Amino acid sequence: DGGEPAAPLWFGPRV
C-alpha cells in the first residue's frame, strides 16, 4: 500500500 503501517511478517508486510 503506502498508507497503512507495516504488518508483521506472518501477515504480509505492506511495503
Swiss-Prot record:
Keyword field: Amidation, Neuropeptide, Secreted
Protein's GO biological process: neuropeptide signaling pathway
Cellular component per GO, a single term: extracellular region
Valine amide: residues carrying this PTM: 15
Cellular compartments annotated: Secreted
Tissue expression notes: Found in the abdominal ganglia and perisympathetic organs. Not detected in the thoracic ganglia, subesophageal ganglion, corpora cardiaca, corpora allata, hypocerebral ganglion or frontal ganglion.
Main location: secreted
UniProt function note: Myoactive.
Family of the protein in this entry: Belongs to the pyrokinin family.
Record's protein name: Pyrokinin
Lineage: Eukaryota, Metazoa, Ecdysozoa, Arthropoda, Hexapoda
